[in-house]
Amino acid sequence: MDEKKVIELEGVSIYHSGESLRNSHRGELVLSEVNLSVGGGELVYLIGKVGSGKSTLLKTLYGEVPLKTGKGRIVGFDLRRLRRSRIPYLRRKIGIVFQDHQLLTDRDVFRNLHYVMKATGWRDETLIRRRIAEVLELVGLHNKEYKMPFELSGGEQQRLAIARAVVNSPAVILADEPTGNLDPAAADEIMRLFATIVAGGCSIVMS
């Protein structure tokens, strides 16, 4: 496998059992013989009907669903050998964006990002504030840092979710239907933002 690739899958079959890595038996086959190669600064769009396995593939890439068949690597982690104790280290190197945002509803925009940064090892408050300012400028929320999530539009909430995903400068972002709940104008804004992020060298795989 080419270690220069941020993601590489060869002959992968993916099973969904509804269980996490604690359960090692195979469940229902949802994808078979998948080959995927993603280099730096690439945007890859997974296309398929509802229930075709797109979300399960993304869950496999971030360690939620175990890979049991084929070869797979993401940001240097071997997915076949990924131990549960190593999943937090993997997720510090990737960004994850969900359709339903999963924001901290009791914290404002700034504190949503501050929480993630403290949880992933940032200690210097000056550096934290500087990085948050940079990221909010990137996603167009620089004048919303003290707004609560319920005060934001759907598109703004998704931009906050993207800010959270990029705050640790990941090599790749995995986005599960990030525009699924948005109106066309807001969805277009998100796609333009993704184009800007990709131009900066980060890869994005989205369904």
Q: What is each stretch, according to the model?
A:
Residues 148-152, 156-158:
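Conserved ABC ATPase signature
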Residues 184-186:
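Helix N-cap at the start of a conserved alpha-helix in ABC-type nucleotide-binding domains
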